[in-house]
């Protein structure tokens, strides 16, 4: 399982990055979600890795 936490604001981001964060289910700074470790989630994490914090 992967725990993802949003640590930076989406103000400076382009619409694609905002959509990726929304698809991960993260709304406010500090919100967390847990996911199964699969290729789709890893790809989404790699697109917005500068905005989130990942722990396994």
From Swiss-Prot:
GO terms for molecular function: structural constituent of ribosome. The keyword Aminoacyl-tRNA synthetase does not apply. InterPro entries: Ribo_uL30_ferredoxin-like_sf, Ribosomal_uL30_bac-type, Ribosomal_uL30_ferredoxin-like. SUPFAM superfamilies: Ribosomal protein L30p/L7e (SSF55129). Keywords: Ribonucleoprotein, Ribosomal protein. GO terms for cellular component: large ribosomal subunit. Pfam families: Ribosomal_L30 (PF00327). The keyword NADP does not apply. One of its GO terms (biological process) is translation. Belongs to the universal ribosomal protein uL30 family. Part of the 50S ribosomal subunit. NCBIfam families: rpmD_bact. This is Large ribosomal subunit protein uL30. It comes from Nitratidesulfovibrio vulgaris (strain ATCC 29579 / DSM 644 / CCUG 34227 / NCIMB 8303 / VKM B-1760 / Hildenborough) (Desulfovibrio vulgaris). The gene is rpmD.
């Amino acid at each position: 399982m992967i725990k993802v936490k949003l640590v930076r604001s989406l103000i400076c981001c382009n619409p694609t990055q905002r959509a990726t964060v929304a698809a991960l289910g993260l709304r406010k700074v500090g919100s967390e979600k847990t996911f199964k470790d699969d290729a789709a989630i890893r790809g989404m994490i790699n697109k917005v890795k500068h905005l989130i914090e990942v722990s396994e």
